[in-house]
Amino acid sequence: WESSDKKDKRLIFTLNNSLQAIDAVTGKSILSFGDSGYVDLRQGLDRDPSSIRRMQSMMPGIIYNDLVILGSAPGENYFSPPGHIRAYNVITGKLEWTFHTIPQPGEFGYDTWPKDAYKYAGAVNVWSEMSVDEKRGIVYLPLGSPTYDYYGADRIGANLFGNSLVALDAKTGKRIWHYQTVHHDLWDYDLASAPQLLTVKHNGKEIDAVAVATKHGFMFVFNRETGEPLFPIEEKPFPASNMPGEHAWPTQPISSLPDFTRHTVTKETLNPFFPDSIKQQWLKRLDSSKSGLYLPPSDKYETVMMPGALGGANYGNTGSNPGKGMMYVMTQEYASTYRLKKVLPPSANLSNDEVKRVKAFYTATCKTCHGANMEGGLAPSLVNAGQRIFYDEFKGIVLNGRGQMPGFVHVDEQTISALYRYLGGNPARPNFFRRMDTTSKVNGPVVASGGAKIKPDANRGAAMFDYPEGVDHPADRYTTDYGLDWMGLLSPPWSSLVAYDLNTGTIKWRKPIGEDSLYSKGDKTTGAPSGVLRKGMVVTSTGIVFATAKGGKLYAFDADNGTVLWETTLSHETNGQPIMFTKNGKQYLVVNATGTFAKDSYNHAAKPGALPRGYLVYALPDIKK
């Protein structure tokens, strides 16, 4: 951000659940911002701040005039904090407005939840990218699903503004319009990609539109000012849930625009590269499971959802040419397998010998600080700690210590696993999402010049682990893991770049992207399993789409017809969004190549002449006169 007279230039950023500001010229923290340079993002959410472990956003937010508008990544467990959208003054750090994504009494949408849900329901957050129409002063929010993702007996109703595209007055935070793309989400179908602002020719008129691509493969396009759909959307019936207390919404909105992913898994669509042993395993597995769009998860059988939690369009996966009405979507055909399991009392998952072992270990090493009933004292509460922390992190804390807690290097794996299960955890739960609830060690000129003092970490408090007293709630809780073990379950192409002409509502072209070494051995027609996760694109006004993909791939496509104009393979895996900038009239493309290649990618870092990890900058060669 910079002031209109260009004298005040600031870098606004989030760190350790805080919002801070740095002078962009000197690199010094601006200590007049917030409370001595620090805004605590755990404050102002109508929850005990000490119970909030994670609130900072995965994305930097968006600037509108003198406001920075922030989303958040509060987690996806039971009792995660709400993902309310907040705007702060970039000069003072003052909170200017809050939009309650889980409505409170008297607010629009409150009646789409149980009356007390705002006290315990969480998420409905923007963890991805917002978009702002600066001329109209409208910010567009792609909101995520409510917690818990896969079982919603404690949130019966449509659950506004979950899974909704919401248009707010960027100055005041007041709602202008909204559209909910999934009612009462039970599948983790967040809106995870940036809404694209473009102008389309529709019914003989030029209309300023906003378009959003979803994780479950649909494209929705609206009038940017009114929220009116430009293409028909039909509410269609879908199966009911067979889970106790659950009421799946009877209909879901289906866009009339062509889908960009498949929506079911069948025996005929299994990966043809599977060895026979795996193919036979899946043929048998599909006989006892169910698959289909909007099929509610169950504890009675496995549901194979396509797309799954990481399918379709995710963050960084959309771009557009606003003047031509063209939108581009990077998508991956990635299924999830779900089976709900009742959360049992900790000791119910353990044998008698394991319970004795855990109690003996706890009494000897943990009781003094964490209390006889695990409710905390000198150290935080451990009640249901296994539901709030992944096993690998838990194991690391036990072995290596944290803060004032020493490490216990003598503890064997069986005892650590039993203790974790005793605390309500499941060691098999995969950690697909990096946690952000630990204090980062900060070095460099900011600290050297007198950085803002880091406040006490939220981990010192006890996270919310049960419903508030007096609130009606289901007797049982159910959970499942993300079911992401088979990224190449379906036949290829596994990842693609899809071009939509939103003037006509058609797909203009589709090209596979990414490189796979496991199944197709580098075949360019298949793409790569999970090929666009944490990848992105840049769309130029001159008709080129630059896109990154799994396997260290960087492409330049003709934006009009999808022809590959140029491609290269980087020495390291790409991460995040590529960017472009212009200096002295020349354009430069910057790509982050700092990642490690997955097991199903070729290790280009080991090849002769490989470049070190870093940012790669490309430009067209100078034309000799």
In which residue ranges do the predicted regions lie?
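Beta-sheet-rich non-transmembrane sensory/scaffold domains
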Residues: W1-N352, S417, R421-K625
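Extracytoplasmic electron-transfer domains, predominantly the class I c-type cytochrome c fold
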Residues: Q56, I138, S351-K356, A360-F433, ...
